[in-house]
């Protein structure tokens, strides 16, 4: 029964339909896997009893021919999404005892489609981080190890628990969030598939806010087809979210295994000169370009001059929005309450926020508050918004010539957990390749496309024009099929 955890979602759906095994069997196998690899720390909260109850319901619906689209599929839910009656912490001491009274819309969509939650995935606190070292509940460990080395590696962030759970076969899919790359970069580090849809495709209702103009739900799976299946269940208009788009949900699964001959793929060749990119990443990029050429794709050189400013623009805007969003956690309205000797209101604010937030969250709040100060707002926040528009224009101009854009997902393979912890700028550079598409609100997917010299997975990123999730699935599926590589951590 342990082999059940190795199935893809499409295989599991078929097996359940054909009565080869039950949803209870499938969930039990994943619970056993979670028990075996708890040292990875992929989950903050586990709910095996509730998962088994849900599995019994799924078995009944399957037996009575009432199965929903993803009936019986075990999933991990990032601990940023509200789950009624189940602890939701955002990996912060500030919310360590918070139990929501309602469900996030995107979580409801997954459950209503038949998905079964196994638990709440670990993450960087309030989704701020690129290495999953900022969780109040401890680091997540990447299931992958470098060849001939036993050093613990980062699973990426902020959805590190999500990516680790999928890579270690502790969930078939994991709901994550992507603000500046928090689904795609972890997917790259763990040999999984991570997709972020266009901004507004998935509801943000019930997703604890970090940066409202950038936050978007995403999904991590082990294949492109599985990502398409899951994303279809998540997308759709939600009147409770003012940024939700009232547009038709495409049939993404139909994009899998479609011919790509004649499509045009844009390559920003100038980016290959960026010193942050390792030689292994550039080699993988060039190999993927050659593979696409062999399949009849036209490669077009494009220019994205303003993406060199994407990183500072992102950290000004996201920190400013975080400063505003996190102001509510003061120990009086929301969050951990710490009272001092005097118990006056200012002391409660100061002590609660000092003790409730971790170092990285405090750093970004301070950066954001500085950028929004009346003496600084024109120089920082307003200027960043103006440059963001130039970045959007770069992409718009490029998509007048091409169907998709191909760039790597991360500048390197996964790095040791204990490296660069005291160097926030170096940490921020890990998102240099994912942030541009986030600023433009574009759909993008990271797929595993090669290995480093140390046998660690490397990811490629396909970026589409606004609302064109179909073509990024189409291209990434073709790359996945042509490469035909297996991405399974040693020992799993």
From Swiss-Prot:
Question: Which keywords accompany this UniProt record?
Answer: ATP-binding, Ligase, Nucleotide-binding, Protein biosynthesis
Q: What is a single Pfam family found in this protein's UniProt entry?
A: Amidase
| Biological processes per GO annotation | translation
Known InterPro entries for this protein? Amidase, Amidase_CS, Amidase_dom, AS_sf, GatA
EC number assigned by the record: 6.3.5.7
Q: Which GO terms describe its cellular component?
A: glutamyl-tRNA(Gln) amidotransferase complex
Q: According to the lineage, what is the superkingdom?
A: Bacteria
For this protein, the record's PROSITE patterns field holds:
AMIDASES
Catalytic activity, as annotated? L-glutamyl-tRNA(Gln) + L-glutamine + ATP + H2O = L-glutaminyl-tRNA(Gln) + L-glutamate + ADP + phosphate + H(+)
Q: What class of enzyme is it?
A: ligase
Where's the active site on this chain?
A: 78 (charge relay system), 158 (charge relay system), 182 (acyl-ester intermediate)
Gene Ontology MF: a single term: ATP binding
How does this chain assemble?
Heterotrimer of A, B and C subunits.
NCBIfam families (UniProt xref): gatA
Family in the record: Belongs to the amidase family. GatA subfamily.
Biological function: Allows the formation of correctly charged Gln-tRNA(Gln) through the transamidation of misacylated Glu-tRNA(Gln) in organisms which lack glutaminyl-tRNA synthetase. The reaction takes place in the presence of glutamine and ATP through an activated gamma-phospho-Glu-tRNA(Gln).
Name of the featured protein: Glutamyl-tRNA(Gln) amidotransferase subunit A
Please tell me the species this chain comes from: Orientia tsutsugamushi (strain Ikeda) (Rickettsia tsutsugamushi)
Q: Which gene encodes it?
A: gatA
